[in-house]
From Swiss-Prot:
Superkingdom to which the source organism belongs: Eukaryota
Phosphoprotein found in the keyword field: yes
Region Disordered, annotated ranges: 186-236
PANTHER family: CHROMOSOME 9, WHOLE GENOME SHOTGUN SEQUENCE, YALI0F12243P
Biased composition (Basic and acidic residues): 201-236
Entry-linked Pfam families: TAPR1-like (PF15251)
Coiled-coil regions listed in the entry: none
Keywords tagged on the record: Phosphoprotein
Protein name stated in the entry: Uncharacterized protein YJR056C
Extra remark: Present with 1890 molecules/cell in log phase SD medium.
Modified residues (Phosphoserine): S221
Length: 236
């Protein structure tokens, strides 16, 4: 990219660097500037001429309309009212065109806000109904008169169905029941299981004490030599 960018400055000149070539280029440059200035001047002149012609054409159109109204036997008051009406129509149309983008943007914003508010209300109503049905607890019906409650009595809670995360498969039902039974018996002070465990521990200790470990006799050097020779014969 740098090489392409530097091509304009690195290209060789088309003419030899002499005084005559430089003077001819200066004359050509000044002539081009004059042509550009004349083109811009001509452009402004044509634009102004067009605007003036448009204004004169509009004025002539207005005069033609007034002459047509006079030829149709219109009174001066009616003609004045007609002129005011046309004037107001033209001014109102120009104002509407200038303010049209702003009004359109405001209208879209208002419509969007109304739609958002309507959607929020539509989502809010069923949620409020569901919450009112699910969480409408009545504590007075279950407890009755709250003034007659004894503080020393522990409250009772009704059993309910456990959630899905707490339910166990059938294969683990027996194991869970036995574990619950042991837990309940232990909580009630049943010492039978504890005695069984302690008795089992004593029996294991007695078995460990009665167990005798026979020590292997230490072999002398002759017997070790005999064993080595026997193993070598077996290998052969």
């Amino acid at each position: 990219m740098e090489q392409m960018h530097s091509l304009e400055s690195s290209l060789p000149p088309e003419q030899p660097p002499t005084k005559q070539a430089i003077e001819s280029l200066n004359l050509e440059l000044s002539q081009e500037f004059k042509l550009a200035a004349n083109a811009v001047t001509r452009l402004y002149r044509v634009a102004n001429e067009k605007n003036s012609l448009t204004k004169h054409q509009g004025y002539l159109t207005c005069l033609d309309d007034i002459l047509c109204a006079l030829d149709s036997n219109v009174t001066a008051d009616e003609l004045r009212a007609w002129c005011y009406k046309r004037r107001n129509d033209i001014l109102s149309n120009s104002q509407d065109k200038s303010l049209n983008p702003v009004k359109e943007r405001e209208r879209k914003l208002n419509k969007f806000s109304e739609n958002q508010h309507r959607e929020n209300e539509a989502h809010k109503e069923p949620f409020e109904k569901d919450s009112a049905v699910k969480y409408n607890f009545s504590f007075n019906e279950s407890n009755g008169d709250l003034s007659n409650i004894n503080e020393n009595i522990a409250p009772k809670f009704r059993l309910s169905m456990p959630p899905l995360s707490v339910e166990h498969p059938p294969r683990n039902a027996s194991r869970i029941k036995s574990w619950k039974a042991r837990t309940i018996n232990h909580g009630r002070g049943d010492t039978r299981n504890l005695n069984d465990i302690t008795g089992l521990g004593h029996e294991r200790e007695r078995d460990r004490e009665n167990t005798h470990y026979e020590k292997k006799p230490k072999l002398d050097s002759d017997s070790e030599v005999d064993i080595r020779s026997f193993r070598q014969d077996m290998d052969l």
